[in-house]
Regions:
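N-terminal type II signal-anchor transmembrane helix
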Residues: 1-33
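Short low-complexity stretches enriched in small and charged residues
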Residues: 2-6, 33, 74-75, 112-115, ...
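N-terminal start-of-chain detector that recognizes signal peptides
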Residues: 6-11, 54-55, 78-80, 130-134, ...
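N-terminal hydrophobic or amphipathic segments with adjacent small-residue motifs
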Residues: 8-10, 35, 105, 299
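Short hydrophobic/aromatic-rich motifs at helix boundaries and adjacent loops
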Residues: 16-21, 63-66, 86-92, 176, ...
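Signal peptide-directed extracytoplasmic domains
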Residues: 25-185
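Bacterial extracytoplasmic/cell-wall-associated proteins, especially those involved in peptidoglycan
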Residues: 43, 119-128, 141-329
């Protein structure tokens, strides 16, 4: 009897040691992560089979037994996962219980138009294309903003998403992010800023975004536009003309383009255009509501990304001749 008990004891110790070893043994042997998709309603046994089918080097029954013994088998969450090299049965279960799905990223770039945003979303083959057949107006209605122009309404940032996420869901996140940023910027506006509403701040910020080549000039550029708004001067900013031309713009802005009237042409129409012309980032939003204190009414690109600012038309014309026409003073 003693000998039998001794053998039982040895077997228990051995099985316990084997289980402990297995729980810490990597499930994958390759360098590339395994892709695992768990559909809603999949049973724990089905999850174990899916893990093995994805390429894990283990036994499905053994993995299922581990799920059951852990007491967490019913807490496994559906989703799209990546099982990286070195993942053990223990760390796998922790990942599945926490719902740590594999996340991809999409960057919406400062200065992009809504059209460019849609093009970027359409290129993402891991995103569900729920808006592909919708017009811009229909998209805004789906987002709860019927009648609101989509331009500039989405905050440029890098967004993480799980495989199979809806493009509409990502747009909703970007929309709400811009809501928060715009609200914060408007609350921090200077007391003398010549803007009547957050919408006007968003419009001006979009212009500042498109006009700024060097970050250090941003507040100064906003200051020029603020000064022009205060005294009733035309803003005369090329990016608004380009936006108004739409697909007619061929990359070369001509004098006749400046004279072609559109709702966005700030050479032919006073004040701000009716909508933003692009997505402004946080810095452009803050510059629009906290413009630099300056006497400048003009600026011209110097060719190195920076701008030259002038207080008079004569000075501005000399700067244009110098920096854009290559004429000496």
């Amino acid at each position: 009897v003693r000998r039998l008990l001794a053998w039982v004891f040895v077997l228990l110790i051995a099985s316990g040691a084997a289980a402990a070893w297995w729980l810490h043994e990597p499930l994958t042997t390759g360098a590339e992560p395994l892709e695992l998709a768990i559909e809603p309603g999949t049973t724990p046994r089905g999850v174990a089979r899916d893990v093995v089918a994805a390429g894990a080097q283990t036994n499905a029954q053994l993995l299922y037994a581990w799920f059951r013994l852990s007491g967490q088998d019913r807490q496994i969450k559906a989703g799209n996962y990546e099982i990286p090299a070195g993942t053990t049965p223990r760390s796998l279960l922790r990942m599945l219980v926490r719902g740590e799905e594999a996340l991809r990223t999409l960057t919406l770039v400062e200065g992009w138009t809504f059209r460019q945003v849609r093009q970027a979303l359409a290129k993402e083959d891991q995103i569900k294309q729920d808006t592909a057949q919708l017009t811009a107006e229909q998209i805004m209605a789906q987002l709860g903003r019927p009648g609101v122009h989509p331009e500039g309404r989405f905050f440029p940032d890098t967004y993480s998403y799980a495989k199979g996420s809806s493009d509409l869901a990502l747009l909703r996140r970007a929309l709400h992010a811009m809501d928060r940023r715009l609200e914060a910027a408007w609350a921090a506006r200077a007391s003398d800023v010549p803007l009547k509403s957050p919408d006007e701040a968003l419009i001006l910020a979009s212009i500042v975004e498109k006009e700024t080549g060097r970050a250090s000039d941003r507040a100064q550029i906003a200051g020029v536009f603020a000064n022009r708004l205060r005294v009733g001067m035309l803003l005369q900013t090329d990016p608004t003309v380009i936006y108004g031309l739409g697909e007619k713009f061929d990359g070369n802005l001509r004098r006749r383009d400046l004279q072609t009237d559109t709702p966005w042409n700030t050479y032919t129409r006073p004040g701000l255009p009716p909508t933003p012309i692009a997505m402004p980032g946080k810095a452009a939003l803050l510059a629009a509501v906290q413009p630099a204190s300056t006497r400048a009414l003009y600026f011209v690109a110097k060719g190195d990304g920076s701008s030259h600012f002038s207080t008079s038309l004569d000075e501005h014309n000399r700067a244009v001749n110098r920096y854009q026409r290559g004429q000496s003073q």
